[in-house]
Swiss-Prot record:
It is an enzyme of class 2 (transferase). This is Putative E3 ubiquitin-protein ligase SINA-like 9. Residues 88-274 are annotated as: SBD. InterPro entries: Sina-like_RING, SINL_plant, Znf_RING, Znf_RING/FYVE/PHD, Znf_SIAH. Its EC number is 2.3.2.27. It comes from the Eukaryota. A zinc finger (SIAH-type) spans 91-149. Keywords: Metal-binding, Transferase, Ubl conjugation pathway, Zinc, Zinc-finger. Disulfide bonds: none annotated. Zn(2+) 1 binds at C96, C103, H115, C119. GO terms for biological process: protein ubiquitination. Zn(2+) 2 binds at C126, C131, H143, H148. A zinc finger (RING-type) spans 38-74.
Length: 276
């Protein structure tokens, strides 16, 4: 269910500011999101929306695929816009999916994806494969510290940003968790063994909210006089660690430079602060 304003669909005059003001003052009703799906592809309707002479709707993506022929009645479709339905879409306010966790934000239909990525109330999953806990990134930090700190397998360490630290992990363990104490963040160091070598990547378990901050990092691996380094202007922020080999933002260590299962690296994390 979503919150929706219906009076905006009846407004047909006034400048942009007046339309926004009237939209915000309009009545609120409940709608089922399913009725906002294209009846053909079942994807969410977005402008432009078309209709045939019998009133059957079709989204802009479906019309060309149907050769502009309505599948319900075979009448032409793709030439006449459904302005009424487009006005309804413009009037709909959707509460954040994290409303039950405390988020009070709402946004107009079609703008929800941008907010969800940055919502501070987004639920983050515990990186332990034997734990199904989810919570805000700060609650996850507290949970991990309390529940998994004594688990040697996870080898939790604490460090501060803007400092080099050396980390050791077994490639077969695949993941190592570090705690950033002052930020209440969990840093996941992951490695993936593939035929061409070992992929190493790091990420914070947190949403992409401004409150979390932005960070850059450097990885360095040294063995027998050989050095492999990788620098990135951004530490990825994820709500759940992936078990898939990364396609970007990784350091690749060839098998010829590996010495058994132990992987020892130097990591440098620094918070990016705008200089104004």
């Amino acid at each position: 269910m979503v919150l929706a304003s219906i009076s905006e669909a009846l407004i047909s005059q006034g400048d942009g500011g007046e339309r926004v003001a009237k939209r915000q003052r309009s009545a609120i009703v409940l709608l089922d999101l399913d009725i906002l799906d294209c009846p053909i592809c079942c994807e969410a309707l977005t402008s432009p929306i078309f209709q045939c002479d019998n009133g059957h709707l079709a989204c802009g993506s479906c019309c060309p695929k149907l050769s502009n022929k309505c599948p319900a009645c075979t009448l032409p479709v793709g030439h006449s816009r459904s302005r009424a339905m487009e006005s309804v879409l413009e009037s709909i306010l959707i509460p954040c999916p994290n409303v039950r966790f405390g988020c009070t934000k709402s946004f107009f239909y079609g703008k929800e994806s941008a907010h969800e990525k940055e919502c501070i109330f987004s639920q983050c999953s515990c990186p332990s494969s034997v734990c199904d806990y989810t919570g805000s990134y700060k609650d996850l930090y507290a949970h991990y510290k309390l529940t998994h700190s004594t688990n040697i397998f996870w080898n939790i360490k604490r460090f501060r940003c803007a400092n080099f630290f050396t980390t050791s992990m077994l490639i077969s363990d695949k993941i190592l968790i570090k705690r950033v104490h002052e930020k209440k963040l969990l840093l996941a160091v992951q490695c993936f063994r593939e035929p061409c070598g070992v992929y190493v990547t790091v990420s914070f378990i947190a949403p992409s909210a401004p409150e979390v901050g932005e960070f850059s990092y450097q990885l360095s691996y040294n063995v027998d006089g050989h050095t492999v380094t990788y620098e990135s202007p951004e530490v990825k922020r994820v709500c759940k660690v992936s078990i898939e080999t990364p396609q970007e933002n990784f350091m690749l260590i060839p098998h010829s430079l590996l010495r058994g299962d132990l992987l020892e690296m130097q990591v440098f994390i620094i918070e990016n602060v705008d200089q104004e």
